[in-house]
Design a protein with these regions (language model features):
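Inter-heme linker and motif-flanking segments adjacent to c-type heme-binding CXXCH motifs
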Residues: 126, 148-153
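Bacterial N-terminal signal peptides that target proteins for export
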Residues: 1-9
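Extracytoplasmic c-type cytochrome modules immediately beyond a signal peptide or single-pass transmembrane anchor
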Residues: 25-137
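Sec/Tat signal peptide C-region and signal peptidase I cleavage site
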Residues: 17-23
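The canonical Cys-X-X-Cys-His
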Residues: 138-149
Length: 153
């Protein structure tokens, strides 16, 4: 009995969680503002992570870099959800190719998620050399996606 109740609750939660995703697509400003906020989260945490990784300022990686890496990893994981089908509208820096080549776009997001996960592991290990390599991969992942899927400023 408990198992079937748990399954029913889980199914209901999944359905309820999916509804706002489709119900809000008609609100371009909300989608664009949220996307920009998540991307800005990545940008600012990346800047801070790079500084800490380079020892400027000299702070412990397993404290400061760890916090930034967690935020970056979490935000990177959200990226595919930020561009659902039907949200290609409004004033945005996202190119149409985000939706036209969703598989390729999601592959770029996966590369970023993997790079931020490597950064997180380096921070946990307090390994500055590994953190530096991971930050290079984060930068490459961001640039690769921006080159293909973001309008130039």
């Amino acid at each position: 009995m408990l198992k079937s109740v748990s399954s029913a609750l889980l199914a209901g939660a999944l359905i309820a969680g999916a509804l706002p995703l489709h119900a809000e697509v008609d609100n371009p400003d909300a989608w664009i503002k949220y996307r920009e906020s998540v991307m800005n989260t990545l940008k600012y945490h990346s800047r801070a992570a790079k500084a800490v990784t380079e020892g400027k300022p000299a702070l412990p990686l397993n404290v400061h870099l760890l916090a930034h890496a967690r935020a970056m990893r979490d935000a990177a994981g959200f990226i595919p959800d930020l561009f659902p089908e039907g949200s290609d509208f409004g004033e945005t820096e996202a190119k149409a190719s985000v939706w036209e080549d969703k598989e390729g776009f999601d592959a770029h997001a996966k590369k970023l998620a993997e790079a931020t996960d490597a950064l997180l592991k380096a921070a946990e290990a307090d390994d500055r050399a590994a953190a530096g390599k991971a930050m290079q991969q984060v930068g490459k992942a961001c640039k690769g996606c921006h080159d293909d899927y973001r309008e130039k400023d």
